[in-house]
Every structure is written in C-alpha cells, then in structure tokens.
Amino acid sequence: MTRVLVVGDIGQPVYHVGDEAMTISTAEYLADAGMQVILATRDTDQSKRYLGAGGSSAYEYMPFLLFPWAPAEREITLERLEEFLVSGVMPNLPDFCPSAQQIRDFVEGIQSVDAVVISGGGNLNSRYGWLLYERAAIALVAQYAKIPVFVSGQSIGPVLSPRDEEVLLRMLRSATSVAVRERSSYEWCREHDLKALAGVDDASDYRAHTPEITLDYADARVEVPELPERYVCVTVHEVSGSKVHELAALLDKIYSEYGLAAVFLGHMGDPASEGGRTGDYKAHELITASMTSPAAVIPILHADATVRIHQGAALNITDRYHPAVFSLSAGIPAVALVPDAFTEMRICGVMGHYGMQNFMTPLHMLGTDIPEKLIASALSLSRGQRQELRVRHEAVTALLHAWREYLAASVRGERQAHMPEGISVAAAVPALEPSLEAINSAVRELLLKTSLAEGNEWALSDRMHSWEAHMRGEFERAEDELQALKRSRMVRAAHRTSRQVQAMRHIGSRFR
C-alpha cells in the first residue's frame, strides 16, 4: 500500500477549525483512494480522538519536528538538520534545537513514506515562520531521500523576510507540484518563475460526518445549543474598543430589520481551558454584553459541528477565513470585516472564487454606512445570484477533485497524470452603489498597503532583534567559558606553585 505523509497544522492545544478541516479533507480523499495516510501532528493522542480515518485502514501518526519561534533559532535549526542530512553525523545542537534522537526519528519517519502532501493552510509566511520552517524541514528530508513532495491549497505570504522567502522558494522548487488557493498567491508564484495551479482551499468540499463529535473539555461536555430558526452566524476575533459597541449595534439592527438573531461561533480556542470559552469566545462575549437583541455564544466546537452551524445560517459575518469558505460552499452569502493585509489577501481569494469579493470592508469601517449596506446587499441577493453561488461551488469542487485525482495518480507514479487547469475567474457581484464602492475600494487598498508595510517592517525587525539576542548569548557564553578557562589555569598554576614550595621545603629540611 502506498504510504503518504499528510502535513497539516493539527494537534495544537488551541483548536483551529480551519486547520483541522483542511487536513481532514485531504487525508480522507487519499485514504478513500486506497493509500495509507500518515498524519503529521503536534499531539498524536489528540489527533486520534478528533480525526476519524476514512478508506479501509486507520491513520498512522508522526510527530512534527518542532521549530523555535525566534527567526535566528529556526534558521540555525534548519541548518543543523541539513548538516546531518549531508554528512550522516549529528552536529553539535544548541539548547533550542530538538534533540538528536528527535531529529533521527523525524528523518527516519519521512524516509519511510512514498510521498509527502503538504496540505493547505496560511503558514507560508514570516508571521508564522516556525510553521513555515517545519514544512521546509519535511520537504528538505524528502528532497535528500528523493521522495516526491506535493504542496496543496496554500497561501503565500504576504509578509516574508528575505531569508524566509529563500527558504520558501527552495521548498516550492523542490516540490513535484504546487497548488495555491488565491489569485495573489498564484501571481507571486509566476513572479518567481514557479509553476503552480491557481487552485482553491483544501476544505472547500469538507464533509461533516459526525456533528455530534465533541472536543476534550476541561470541565464538562459542551453541547451545541438549540439554534434560532433564522440567524446570522458571527465569527470575529480582532474586535476591541469602540468597534465592540459598533458591531453590537449593527447586529441589533440586523435583528430588528431582518429578524436574524446573532449566533457567535468561534474558530480558535482551547477546549481544555474554561470549557472552550477562550480565544474567539472572549471577543464574542464582549460584543453580546453590548447588545439588546437575542444572541447565542458557542464555545469552540469540533469542525464537523462548526460547519453545520455556518451552513444553517442566512448570513455569515466574519473577520476570519474559513467561515467564508464554509458559508459560500453552501450558497450562503458572507460579509467580511477585514483587520489586516494577511486577512484581506486570504478572504479576498475565497470570496473572489464566488464573485463575492466586493462584500468586504476594513474592520475599522464599522460605525459607517458601508458594513450595513454590504449586509443589506448580501441578504437581498436575487434567486439568480444565489443560484450562481451554487454554480461557482460546483466549479470550485470540480477543480479540487481534479487536483486530488492528479495528486493521487502522481503519488502512485502514474505517468499519464496531468495537472488540471486553474480556477476560472468569476464575475463580481455588485455590492454597493458606485460612489460608496469607490470609497470602499480606496480604504481597502489603503489598509492593504499600510498593513503590508507594517508587517514587512515587523518581520525585518523581528529577525534583526532575534539575531542580536542570539549573538549576545553566544558572546556571553564564550565570555563565561573564557573566564572559566582562566580560573582553571590560575588554579593549576597555584597548584604547581604550591607543589614547588612544598618540594623546596622538603629539600631544605634535609639540610637542617
């Protein structure tokens, strides 16, 4: 049986719905195709509980080689790994590196598979640089072992330090095939002479098999509450200050005008802490405290239950990526409140696949007329426009399935495997009158530029300070070793002098 390693961001203490969903979707397809799937995870026991195996056999699991967060330390860790791969001799490892045994086990684990699939995500950037390097490490071992690597459903950047970009480019160029999930990532690949598929998110066809499945809560089992007959699903995490009250007022207005009660649904949270009432839940609590209309706040749930709730809504409002994926895949409109360039790039990508890229505005536009008008437009989509959402979803899933068929055929070594054509461009659905659309486009562009500039400045500064701290630590260690050496020499000299004095006294005593 063909053994394939699927790499996703799973097994985290803080459960992330989108990361789990992308990995599950990819793993299920490959298992159904008759392959033995090995899942890279941070927590084997957790992943065994949360992920059910498809196909004819259970999943196997392999621990990640965990990288430090600091840029200097992760760069050095990757260099030490390659030194071992080149020479077969384990180099001296700083304290921040994984142990020699962990590195050996990691290398042997990858060498035991027939192919590697780096499943979708938004980890290929400096913002989450340690996750980028963990994937680069897997690809590096595979490259030395001549094991094919396939990169699926990724977002590239937008923030990359020059060194991180070098690491990323080497990883992508070593891959057999690359698929990205938005047009901006595809253009980045073209600019860097990388052949890539203009693809879609790996969870675009996510199937919620067991909505009753629960997470490991610290105190008691958390049940999905009874939901209103008609509701707006809200997932936000970047809201603070006056924006809390402005979003609360907007949701109150949605209830009074459309009869849609707010259901707050988190996408990140630690189920073992406060019964899952962490992460997004905290932001949701703040908003409901300022509302006068009915609202339900739900702790973090398993991906299966989460998807069902998104797809039962009349509308989804979000500042996160995967709520838009799950909403639009069911033909339900979404309105995005964008906090930064990182989110703008990703959500614009998935919204663009459905022609809904105009239904976005910066988060700081809360308190203006634009969010309210976007919501009104989303809720008043014509029957034909809603039908077009379903047609576009068919195109999205058709491409994803064609990509996976190519992936499976390539993993099996079938020479006739051909990469599909990229996703077609959808006609944009109008969301605002022209004057407001011009304003909204301008503020979105301004947010993108300023946030991207801030992000790039942060990445460079973070790397510089990291290397300064590392070199300072190296200097201090060298200084300590020098002082210890000096002390040891002084001690040895003192011992020699003492022995000489004792010898002279002994000789002198003979002549008394």
Language model feature labels by segment:
Residues M1-H465:
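Active-site anion-handling motifs in enzyme catalytic cores
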